[in-house]
């Protein structure tokens, strides 16, 4: 459901002429979305396995980023992980929409990823979507664990560096909707887990 929602949202934004960066920690997600699911939006993708290369050499980081940043390009989506698109890449003039399909525990790279489209002084409206799987009330999952740890780490970094702006720069998720689905119960979760660990 998260990948389907992500692709639908990217298409919706593209119809409005808006580019989107999709963040994922997982290489398979990055490749499948970039190669197959969003081919119609001429998506490009980068991760650690993609050569840095040069502009003009197809399927290199530099060329894919240039294609995405080009306002006249029909490339409407960049799919990436934090590490491959962390430092020195500025996207705020080309893109104002980010979707976090999933996240990792690395607070520094998470903040840098937000900074790709949210530069100080740039007043354009930004839309950042952080997706979490729907769960029954009272059940914890890895996405909530990551969310809580990121908040704690950002708070600690802010205190350690004596930089209250650091905490303000991070997206305040307390205003977002909690992904609670009252229709999912413990038996549904047990069935999903059984399917995942079933020998193939």
Spans of model-derived segments:
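A conserved SF2-helicase RecA2
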Residues: 105-200
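SF2 helicase motor core recognition
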Residues: 30-34, 62-65, 72, 76-102, ...
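Conserved helicase ATPase core of P-loop NTP-dependent helicases/translocases
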Residues: 21-23, 40-85
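Conserved helicase/translocase motor-coupling segment
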Residues: 1-39
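Short, well-ordered coil/turn elements that cap or connect secondary structure elements
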Residues: 38-41, 123
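Cofactor-binding loop segments of dinucleotide-utilizing enzymes, especially the Rossmann-like FAD-
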Residues: 25, 48, 103, 131-133
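Alpha-helical elements of Rossmann-like donor-binding domains used by nucleotide-donor carbohydrate transfer enzymes
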Residues: 5-9, 32, 36, 63, ...
């Amino acid at each position: 459901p998260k990948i389907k929602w992500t692709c639908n949202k990217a298409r919706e934004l593209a119809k409005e002429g808006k580019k989107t960066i999709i963040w994922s920690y997982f290489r398979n997600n990055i490749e499948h979305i970039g190669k197959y699911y969003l081919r119609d939006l001429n998506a490009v993708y980068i991760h650690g396995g993609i050569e840095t290369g040069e502009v003009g050499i197809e399927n290199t980081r530099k060329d894919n980023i240039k294609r995405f940043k080009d306002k006249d390009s029909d490339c409407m989506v960049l799919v990436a992980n934090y590490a491959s698109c962390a430092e020195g890449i500025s996207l705020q003039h080309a893109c104002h929409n980010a979707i976090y399909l999933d996240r990792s525990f690395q607070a520094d790279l998470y903040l840098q990823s937000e900074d790709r489209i949210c530069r100080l002084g740039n007043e354009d409206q930004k839309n950042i979507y952080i997706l979490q799987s729907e769960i029954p009330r009272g059940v914890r999952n890895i996405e909530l664990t990551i969310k809580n740890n990121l908040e704690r780490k950002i708070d600690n970094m802010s205190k350690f560096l004596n930089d209250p702006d650091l905490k303000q720069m991070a997206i305040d998720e307390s205003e977002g909707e909690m992904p609670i689905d009252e229709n999912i119960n413990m038996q549904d979760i047990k069935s999903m887990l059984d399917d995942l660990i079933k020998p193939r």
